[in-house]
Amino acid sequence: MGETEITCAAGTIVGTVRDNARLFDAIPFLEKAHPFDDPVALKQGLLLDATTPHPNALSVSAPLSARPGTDCPVVVWLSAPAELGDGFVHVHVPHRDGFEGFLPFAADAIGHFRGVADVKLALRWIQRNIEAFGGDPTNVTVVGAGEEAAVALWLCRRDHYAGEFRRVWAASPEFPRAPYEKRKWIVRYLLSAPLTRAKLNELAENRPGRVGRSYRRYAKFFGPMGPQPHDASELAELAVVRVEDALDPGAIAEFAR
Protein backbone atom coordinates (compact mmCIF):
# COMPACT_ATOMS: atom_id res chain seq x y z
CA MET A 1 0.00 0.00 0.00
CA GLY A 2 1.37 3.41 -0.99
CA GLU A 3 0.23 7.00 -1.21
CA THR A 4 -1.28 8.79 -4.19
CA GLU A 5 -2.17 12.41 -4.91
CA ILE A 6 -4.83 14.10 -7.00
CA THR A 7 -4.98 17.82 -7.74
CA CYS A 8 -8.39 19.30 -8.47
CA ALA A 9 -10.42 22.42 -7.72
CA ALA A 10 -10.73 21.38 -4.07
CA GLY A 11 -6.95 21.30 -3.76
CA THR A 12 -4.31 18.58 -3.53
CA ILE A 13 -5.80 15.44 -1.99
CA VAL A 14 -3.60 12.68 -0.57
CA GLY A 15 -4.96 9.14 -0.57
CA THR A 16 -3.73 5.56 -0.64
CA VAL A 17 -3.38 2.79 -3.21
CA ARG A 18 -4.89 -0.56 -2.23
CA ASP A 19 -6.41 -3.53 -4.06
CA ASN A 20 -5.88 -2.00 -7.50
CA ALA A 21 -7.77 1.16 -6.52
CA ARG A 22 -7.00 4.70 -5.43
CA LEU A 23 -8.75 5.35 -2.12
CA PHE A 24 -9.47 8.73 -0.57
CA ASP A 25 -11.12 7.87 2.73
CA ALA A 26 -11.84 11.28 4.26
CA ILE A 27 -12.24 14.33 2.05
CA PRO A 28 -13.77 17.26 3.96
CA PHE A 29 -16.25 19.25 1.89
CA LEU A 30 -18.02 21.37 4.51
CA GLU A 31 -16.77 24.08 6.84
CA LYS A 32 -16.91 23.21 10.53
CA ALA A 33 -20.22 24.35 11.98
CA HIS A 34 -22.57 23.88 14.90
CA PRO A 35 -24.82 20.80 14.61
CA PHE A 36 -27.99 22.74 13.76
CA ASP A 37 -26.42 25.30 11.41
CA ASP A 38 -26.91 25.18 7.67
CA PRO A 39 -23.92 23.73 5.80
CA VAL A 40 -21.31 25.92 4.12
CA ALA A 41 -19.00 24.58 1.41
CA LEU A 42 -15.33 24.28 2.34
CA LYS A 43 -13.08 26.75 0.56
CA GLN A 44 -11.05 25.38 -2.36
CA GLY A 45 -7.33 25.05 -3.01
CA LEU A 46 -6.38 23.24 0.21
CA LEU A 47 -3.96 20.42 0.97
CA LEU A 48 -6.19 17.60 2.22
CA ASP A 49 -5.07 14.38 3.89
CA ALA A 50 -7.68 11.76 2.99
CA THR A 51 -5.76 8.69 4.17
CA THR A 52 -7.77 8.04 7.36
CA PRO A 53 -11.55 7.45 7.40
CA HIS A 54 -13.70 10.11 9.07
CA PRO A 55 -17.51 9.92 9.52
CA ASN A 56 -18.17 13.52 8.44
CA ALA A 57 -16.13 13.51 5.23
CA LEU A 58 -16.90 12.04 1.83
CA SER A 59 -14.82 9.18 0.47
CA VAL A 60 -13.84 8.36 -3.12
CA SER A 61 -12.70 5.07 -4.62
CA ALA A 62 -11.41 5.09 -8.20
CA PRO A 63 -9.81 2.45 -10.43
CA LEU A 64 -6.02 2.65 -10.26
CA SER A 65 -5.82 3.29 -14.00
CA ALA A 66 -8.49 6.03 -14.02
CA ARG A 67 -7.27 9.49 -14.99
CA PRO A 68 -8.93 12.72 -16.17
CA GLY A 69 -10.73 11.84 -19.39
CA THR A 70 -11.30 8.17 -18.51
CA ASP A 71 -14.94 9.12 -17.84
CA CYS A 72 -15.90 6.27 -15.52
CA PRO A 73 -19.55 6.23 -14.40
CA VAL A 74 -19.89 7.79 -10.95
CA VAL A 75 -22.02 6.15 -8.26
CA VAL A 76 -22.83 8.28 -5.21
CA TRP A 77 -23.73 6.16 -2.22
CA LEU A 78 -25.86 7.64 0.54
CA SER A 79 -26.06 4.15 2.06
CA ALA A 80 -23.08 1.82 2.55
CA PRO A 81 -21.33 1.21 -0.81
CA ALA A 82 -21.63 -2.15 -2.55
CA GLU A 83 -19.28 -3.84 -5.02
CA LEU A 84 -20.40 -3.18 -8.61
CA GLY A 85 -17.43 -4.57 -10.52
CA ASP A 86 -14.71 -2.76 -12.42
CA GLY A 87 -14.87 0.63 -14.06
CA PHE A 88 -16.80 2.78 -11.57
CA VAL A 89 -15.82 5.73 -9.44
CA HIS A 90 -17.57 5.39 -6.08
CA VAL A 91 -18.33 8.29 -3.75
CA HIS A 92 -19.76 7.74 -0.28
CA VAL A 93 -21.50 10.86 1.03
CA PRO A 94 -22.39 11.35 4.71
CA HIS A 95 -25.12 13.67 5.89
CA ARG A 96 -26.67 14.75 9.16
CA ASP A 97 -29.64 12.71 10.28
CA GLY A 98 -31.97 12.83 13.27
CA PHE A 99 -32.83 16.15 14.85
CA GLU A 100 -29.61 17.75 13.57
CA GLY A 101 -30.48 16.93 9.98
CA PHE A 102 -34.25 17.17 9.81
CA LEU A 103 -35.79 19.15 12.66
CA PRO A 104 -37.20 22.21 10.85
CA PHE A 105 -37.01 25.77 12.13
CA ALA A 106 -39.58 28.48 11.55
CA ALA A 107 -37.18 30.53 9.42
CA ASP A 108 -36.32 27.63 7.09
CA ALA A 109 -37.52 27.78 3.50
CA ILE A 110 -40.24 25.32 2.56
CA GLY A 111 -38.68 21.97 1.72
CA HIS A 112 -35.29 22.88 3.24
CA PHE A 113 -33.60 20.31 5.47
CA ARG A 114 -30.00 20.42 6.65
CA GLY A 115 -29.45 16.71 5.98
CA VAL A 116 -30.49 17.17 2.36
CA ALA A 117 -28.43 20.35 2.05
CA ASP A 118 -25.33 18.42 3.17
CA VAL A 119 -25.78 16.02 0.25
CA LYS A 120 -26.58 18.86 -2.15
CA LEU A 121 -23.21 20.48 -1.41
CA ALA A 122 -21.47 17.12 -1.80
CA LEU A 123 -23.03 16.73 -5.25
CA ARG A 124 -21.76 20.18 -6.21
CA TRP A 125 -18.30 19.13 -4.97
CA ILE A 126 -18.52 16.06 -7.19
CA GLN A 127 -19.42 18.16 -10.22
CA ARG A 128 -16.36 20.36 -9.69
CA ASN A 129 -13.83 17.68 -8.78
CA ILE A 130 -14.72 14.15 -9.83
CA GLU A 131 -13.20 14.40 -13.30
CA ALA A 132 -9.75 14.58 -11.67
CA PHE A 133 -10.42 11.11 -10.21
CA GLY A 134 -11.33 9.71 -13.64
CA GLY A 135 -15.09 10.09 -13.19
CA ASP A 136 -17.64 11.50 -15.62
CA PRO A 137 -19.52 14.42 -13.99
CA THR A 138 -22.29 14.05 -16.58
CA ASN A 139 -22.91 10.39 -15.65
CA VAL A 140 -23.72 10.39 -11.93
CA THR A 141 -26.12 7.98 -10.20
CA VAL A 142 -27.29 8.50 -6.61
CA VAL A 143 -28.10 5.37 -4.59
CA GLY A 144 -29.82 5.13 -1.21
CA ALA A 145 -31.89 2.73 0.89
CA GLY A 146 -34.49 3.43 3.55
CA GLU A 147 -34.00 6.90 5.05
CA GLU A 148 -31.21 7.62 2.54
CA ALA A 149 -33.54 6.71 -0.33
CA ALA A 150 -35.94 9.35 0.96
CA VAL A 151 -33.12 11.92 0.81
CA ALA A 152 -32.26 10.83 -2.74
CA LEU A 153 -35.86 11.28 -3.86
CA TRP A 154 -36.07 14.67 -2.15
CA LEU A 155 -33.10 15.79 -4.23
CA CYS A 156 -35.17 14.96 -7.33
CA ARG A 157 -37.83 17.53 -6.49
CA ARG A 158 -38.16 20.36 -8.98
CA ASP A 159 -37.20 22.89 -6.28
CA HIS A 160 -33.96 20.98 -5.55
CA TYR A 161 -32.83 19.31 -8.77
CA ALA A 162 -30.16 21.23 -10.68
CA GLY A 163 -28.68 18.54 -12.90
CA GLU A 164 -25.92 17.38 -10.51
CA PHE A 165 -26.89 13.75 -11.19
CA ARG A 166 -28.67 11.80 -13.90
CA ARG A 167 -30.25 8.86 -12.09
CA VAL A 168 -31.49 7.73 -8.67
CA TRP A 169 -31.87 4.20 -7.33
CA ALA A 170 -34.13 4.42 -4.26
CA ALA A 171 -34.52 1.17 -2.32
CA SER A 172 -37.53 1.01 0.00
CA PRO A 173 -37.63 4.75 0.75
CA GLU A 174 -38.69 5.51 4.30
CA PHE A 175 -40.36 8.87 4.90
CA PRO A 176 -41.71 10.14 8.25
CA ARG A 177 -44.97 8.53 9.25
CA ALA A 178 -46.70 11.78 10.22
CA PRO A 179 -46.21 15.53 9.69
CA TYR A 180 -43.66 17.14 11.98
CA GLU A 181 -46.27 19.50 13.43
CA LYS A 182 -48.05 16.48 14.93
CA ARG A 183 -44.83 15.33 16.62
CA LYS A 184 -43.41 18.72 17.63
CA TRP A 185 -44.74 18.44 21.18
CA ILE A 186 -42.89 15.19 21.85
CA VAL A 187 -39.66 16.60 20.38
CA ARG A 188 -39.90 19.58 22.72
CA TYR A 189 -40.62 17.26 25.65
CA LEU A 190 -37.67 14.96 24.88
CA LEU A 191 -35.17 17.76 24.38
CA SER A 192 -36.53 19.92 27.23
CA ALA A 193 -35.43 23.00 25.32
CA PRO A 194 -36.92 25.65 23.03
CA LEU A 195 -36.87 24.42 19.44
CA THR A 196 -34.74 27.22 18.05
CA ARG A 197 -31.42 26.96 16.25
CA ALA A 198 -29.54 28.94 18.92
CA LYS A 199 -30.95 26.97 21.86
CA LEU A 200 -30.38 23.58 20.26
CA ASN A 201 -26.82 24.46 19.28
CA GLU A 202 -26.28 25.52 22.89
CA LEU A 203 -27.76 22.23 24.12
CA ALA A 204 -25.58 20.21 21.75
CA GLU A 205 -22.48 22.00 23.02
CA ASN A 206 -23.25 21.86 26.74
CA ARG A 207 -24.96 18.46 26.90
CA PRO A 208 -23.81 16.64 23.75
CA GLY A 209 -25.34 13.29 24.68
CA ARG A 210 -28.88 14.54 25.19
CA VAL A 211 -29.67 15.29 21.54
CA GLY A 212 -28.67 11.80 20.41
CA ARG A 213 -30.43 10.03 23.28
CA SER A 214 -33.58 12.04 22.73
CA TYR A 215 -33.63 11.23 19.04
CA ARG A 216 -33.16 7.51 19.65
CA ARG A 217 -36.16 7.56 21.98
CA TYR A 218 -38.16 9.49 19.41
CA ALA A 219 -37.26 7.13 16.54
CA LYS A 220 -38.06 4.05 18.62
CA PHE A 221 -41.72 5.06 18.85
CA PHE A 222 -42.30 7.30 15.83
CA GLY A 223 -39.75 6.20 13.24
CA PRO A 224 -36.99 8.27 11.66
CA MET A 225 -37.17 11.97 10.93
CA GLY A 226 -36.56 12.94 7.34
CA PRO A 227 -37.68 15.21 4.53
CA GLN A 228 -41.44 15.55 4.16
CA PRO A 229 -44.08 15.58 2.82
CA HIS A 230 -43.21 13.40 -0.18
CA ASP A 231 -45.24 13.94 -3.35
CA ALA A 232 -44.11 12.02 -6.44
CA SER A 233 -45.76 14.61 -8.70
CA GLU A 234 -43.11 17.14 -7.56
CA LEU A 235 -40.18 15.16 -8.99
CA ALA A 236 -38.23 16.73 -11.85
CA GLU A 237 -38.82 15.02 -15.19
CA LEU A 238 -35.10 15.17 -16.09
CA ALA A 239 -34.10 12.79 -13.30
CA VAL A 240 -34.37 9.05 -14.06
CA VAL A 241 -35.72 7.39 -10.92
CA ARG A 242 -36.04 3.72 -10.01
CA VAL A 243 -37.80 2.83 -6.78
CA GLU A 244 -37.03 -0.78 -5.86
CA ASP A 245 -37.35 -3.08 -2.87
CA ALA A 246 -33.62 -3.53 -2.32
CA LEU A 247 -30.10 -2.59 -3.36
CA ASP A 248 -29.26 -5.05 -6.16
CA PRO A 249 -25.57 -4.53 -7.06
CA GLY A 250 -25.84 -6.19 -10.47
CA ALA A 251 -28.90 -4.21 -11.46
CA ILE A 252 -27.43 -0.98 -10.09
CA ALA A 253 -24.24 -1.52 -12.13
CA GLU A 254 -26.27 -1.93 -15.32
CA PHE A 255 -28.47 1.05 -14.43
CA ALA A 256 -25.49 3.32 -13.70
CA ARG A 257 -23.37 2.67 -16.81
Language model region names:
Residues I110-A132:
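Alpha/beta-hydrolase active-site loop
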Residues Q44-L64, D97, G111, A117-K120, ...:
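Mature extracellular catalytic domain of secreted serine hydrolases
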Residues M1-G111, G223, D245-A256:
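Non-catalytic accessory segments of hydrolases
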